């Protein structure tokens, strides 16, 4: 299940295994694991969004990120991390990528607890809102049963 290179194993395991363990423990105790983990994902995502905003609001940082958005997205969701994706548009107007297969979702599914990773998706969606001058949208997610996660990023000088 955690096959592949050591970096990929560490990346997938560090994110998925704690979520699956919490999901199983909460379910065993009779708690609504999905709601609790999703609330945690939302809260942590908002917290990370604040950190992301502080960093990216430093003058020049958001422009630098946008000029290298393709490299940035490679580091966050590249094939070297186990994602399968399709680039649908490139800057300057928009950077769009469809994630067709997510290593987090695949590992959780193999472990029999695919709903455990919904909290990671929610955290991701919340913290990506923190980017200064970069507008982020995602309307679908593989973990929610969709064909893809539809990431769309646009540079927006008016977004604070």
Language model region names:
Residues 10, 60-61, 116:
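A general boundary/transition motif marking the beginning of the first structured unit of a protein
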